[in-house]
Amino acid sequence: MRSRYIFLVIIFGLATLVWSAYLFALQIFDPFKLDRFRQLRYIPDKEILIPTRGSIYDANGDLLVSSISYYQLDIDRKAVSLWAKKQKMDLQEAYARISKVLSNCSALSAGDILKRLNLNDKLTSIQISNKIREMELDRIISTFDKEKIPGLNYSFASMRRIYSKDILAARLLGSVQPVSDGYDPETRSKSLYKLNGICGIEASYNDLLAGEYGWREVVYDANHERVPYPNLHEKQSQDGFNLKLTIDSKIQEIVEHALYEGAVKYSAKNVGAIAMDPNTGRILALAGVSPEDRNIDPGLVRVKSNIPLSFMFEPGSTMKPLTMLPALEHKLVRPNEKIACGVYQVGKRTIRDTHHYGALTPKEIIAKSSNVGVAKIAERIGKKRLYEKFISLGYGQKTGLGLYGESSGLFRKPDDWDGYTLHSLSFGQAISVTALQHVTAFSAVANGGKMMKPYIVDSITNKTGQVIQQFEPEVLREIASKAVTDTIRSYMKAVIDDGTGKHIKMDYITIAGKTGTAQKNVEGTRGYSSGKYTSVFVGMFPAEEPKMVLLVFYDEPAPGYHYGSTSAAPTFKKIVEDILFMPNYNIIGFDERMTQRSLQMPDLRGKHISQAEAILNKYGFLYKIEGVDSSSVVIDQFPKANVSVDPHHPITIKVGSGLSKADSLTVKGTMPDLTGLTIRRAMQVAAKHKVPLKIKGSGIVRQQSILPGSLITGTAACTIEASI
C-alpha cells in the first residue's frame, strides 16, 4: 500500500514538473503559440472610424460649409458599482462624482446626468447623451483616465452640416442627408454612417468631400472595458477634402439681395443671375431664387433646382449681337451700310420691329434692337455658318462646369429647321439656352474672342491646407477675332448710350449690354404663350476692357415688367452699383468722381427705426424701409455697414421684431438670441452684452423671456429655460 502511494506521488510530481517545464518553454522560447492561444480567448472587435466631411470656402477664404461630429456617451453601471465597492464608496457618491466630471467637461448638467444614472435599475448601460462634441469627448476620456474611473463607453453618433451664411448660395451649395451603406465585410459592421450629397456642390463633389472610413481593432474584458492588447490592427480614416470656390460671397450676397427684391417687386416666378470673370471663366456669383425662398426653411431651399443651370429660356434679343458675329467675321455687312427695317415679309410670316425705324446701320440695329435688320443679316449668313457659330459659342451642349442638374439647352440641327428657323434664331427664338451658356458665350465677346471653360472650384485642399489640385483658366477655342468682338462690344455699348438700355447708363463706369424679351414656349408644342415672358439683360463692364460679365433674367414677371428693359436691366444696374461700392473692389475705368462723393455706411442693425431714420437723415442718405412698424428695430440693411456708399444711391432698411441669430450675437445694445446655445455659452454671450440671466433647467437653451434683437434697456434680467 505504501509503495503504491509513493508511486502515485512520483507520477503526479513528474506530471507537474513536465507541465511546468512546458509552460516555461512556451513562454520563453515559443511566444507565437502563446500569442495564438490568447487570440483564441480574445477576438478583437472592429470600431469604425468616421471621416469628417470636407469644408467649403469662398474665394476669399470665408467659411461657407463645415461639419460637426457628435458622439454617444454611455456609462456601464455594473462597472461603476464594482469600482465603488473597491473604493469603499457609496454608489450614489460614485454617481455624483461621475456626474460632476461629465458636467465639468461638457455642456451637460450634473443634475440631469445624475437623474439618468438612476433610471431603470434593470439596464446595465445608460445613455447619457448623443450630442457630445469631439473636444468635449477628449476632455471626458482624459479625466476618466486620470481619475481611473471605469465604465465609460462612447461611439460615433452623427454628423451635422453647418451652413455658416444661412440661406446665402443655398441652391448652389446644395444639401446632404445621412445614409446607411449596409453591411461592410471588412469592418464587420451592419451599417456605416455617412453624409451623402444629394444636390448642388455637395452632390457634385461628394466623392471628394466625403472622405474614407477607417477602423481599429479593440478588445473588451468581461466588464466591457477596453483592455490594452498587442498586435492590434488599424486603418486610419481619411477626412474629406476641402473646396475653395471661385464664388465671392460678398458679390453673391449683393446679387441675391437684388434678386429677392426684384422677385417681389416684379412678381416673378423665378429670378436668376450669374457673374463671371470673362478673362478666366471664374464664376463670381451664381444665384437663382423664388419669392418664397426667404419664408421657408433654408434646408428646403437647398434642395431646390439651381435655376441658372437648369432653367431653359429663349434668349430673345440678347441673341442679336451673337448673330452679328459671323456677319462681321465674313464681311457680310459693312459698318456704315444702311439696312431697311420696320416690316419684313418672309413667306406667310411677317417680321416687325417694335418701332418703325427706317434704314439702320449694323450698330443701330443692335442699339435699337431691330428684328427685321438682324433677320435680313441672318439671310446673308446662311444656315451653315449661323449653326456653326452658335455651336462654337456652346449652345446645345453642357458647358463642362461639372455641377449636377445642368441642362444642355435646345438647339436643333439645320436638317430640322423649317423655312422660318433661320430668321427666328437671329433674334433669339427657336433656341433655348441656360443662363450659364449665355454668360459664357458673352464672356468670349468680352475677352477678345476666347471661349473660356467656366469653373466654380478654385482649388482642392486637405485638412492641413495643402493644395491637392489647383484649377486654372482653360481656353476651349477661339470664336472670333479681337477686332470683331471689339466691334460687337461697341454695338452693345451703343445699347446703353443711345438704345433700349439707356436708362441704366451710369456716370462713373461704361457698360456694354443688351436687353431681351421672349414669350415662353408652351410645353410640348412649338407655340408660344400669350401672357408669359422671360426678360433678360446681359452686360459687361467696363465696356472697353470688361472685368465682369453679368446676366440677369426673370421668369414670368408681371405684365408691364416683362420687358428686359423694365425688370432685368434695372436689377443689373442695382447689382453693378452695389458691387462698385464694395470696399477694396477695384474695377478699371471706375471714375474717381464716385469715391469723392461717397460716405461710409453706418451700422443700423438693432437700432429702433426712429433712431435709424435720424442717422440717415443727418447724413443726407436716400433710403427706403421694408416692413414698417413703429415698434420695430432694424434687422438688416443694404449695403452693409462700413461700405462706401453714394448718398444719392437708395439704401434699403429692413425692419422687424428682432435680428437674425447671427446678427443678434454681434450687434451691441440688442438682446442676443441664446436659443440653441449651451448654458455656459449663453452665459458668456449674455455677459458680453451685459444682460443679467435667470436660469431655469440645464442643457440647451430652449426659450428666453426677452426677444432676440430687442433693445436692451436698464438692468432687466432675461430668464432662459433649458433642457437636454
PLM regions and their residue ranges:
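Soluble non-cytosolic domains of exported or imported proteins
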Residues: P51, K85-E93, N130-M135, L195, ...
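Beta-lactam-recognizing serine transpeptidase/beta-lactamase-like catalytic domain environment
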Residues: V65, Y220-E234, Q238, V271-S317, ...
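Ligand-recognition elements built from short beta-strands and adjacent flexible loops
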Residues: K505-Y508, V522, G531, V552-I724
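Residue-level detector of short coil/turn "hinge" positions at structural boundaries
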Residues: G151, N270, R334-P335, Q397, ...
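Preference for bulky hydrophobic residues occupying beta-strand positions
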Residues: L73-I75, G174, L245, F311, ...
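Bulky hydrophobic/aromatic "packing anchor" residues in well-ordered structure
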Residues: I140, L172, Y205, I339, ...
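Periplasmic/cell-envelope proteins involved in peptidoglycan metabolism and beta-lactam response
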Residues: M1-I296, K384-G396, G405, I504-D507, ...
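Extracytoplasmic
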Residues: L49-T52, A59, S66-Q72, L123, ...
